Amino acid sequence: VNGVTPPAVQHLTAEVTADSGEYQVLARWDTPKVVKGVSFLLRLTVAADDGRERLVSTARTTETTYRFTQLALGNYRLTVRAVNAWGQQGDPAS
């Protein structure tokens, strides 16, 4: 297997702010070590009225912060995991 398995994401926090009736979330996280070529996959879901999770947004970034905007009030779950250039994924945080 090529490369080093990406490190687990840790210390995931989300700061929510209101903006004209909509909400935005600034997510921050880190990893125990820096690995070259790692990016982060983000998956934001919301609890639907029927109790199931509905996908709201996905994103990929090389930063350790990401801002989601124009969100309605709701019960959200954010999952973040590191992925290397070969597609290997580290343990997620949510």
Regions found by a protein language model. Give the residues of each.
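Pro/Thr/Ser/Gly-rich low-complexity, intrinsically disordered linker/stalk tracts
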Residues: 1-36, 72-73, 85-94
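Intrinsically disordered, low-complexity segments enriched in polar/charged residues with Gly/Pro
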Residues: 2, 54-56, 69
